[in-house]
């Protein structure tokens, strides 16, 4: 089912972005 696959891929990309951005945000938060 294609729409579901597309949503799944988008969710995975968002989660990957959060995983990468999370530590950076934490470091910036500590620095300020």
Swiss-Prot record:
It is found in: Secreted. Hemolymph. Pfam families: Cecropin. InterPro entries: Cecropin. GO terms for biological process: antibacterial humoral response; defense response to fungus; defense response to Gram-positive bacterium; innate immune response; killing of cells of another organism. Its main location: secreted. It comes from the Eukaryota. Keywords: Antibiotic, Antimicrobial, Fungicide, Immunity, Innate immunity, Secreted. Cecropins have lytic and antibacterial activity against several Gram-positive and Gram-negative bacteria. Also has activity against fungi. Monomer. Belongs to the cecropin family. This is Cecropin. It comes from Oiketicus kirbyi (Bagworm moth).
């Amino acid at each position: 089912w294609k729409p579901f696959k597309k949503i799944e891929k988008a969710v995975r990309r968002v989660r990957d972005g959060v995983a990468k951005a999370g530590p950076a945000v934490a470091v910036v938060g500590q620095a300020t």
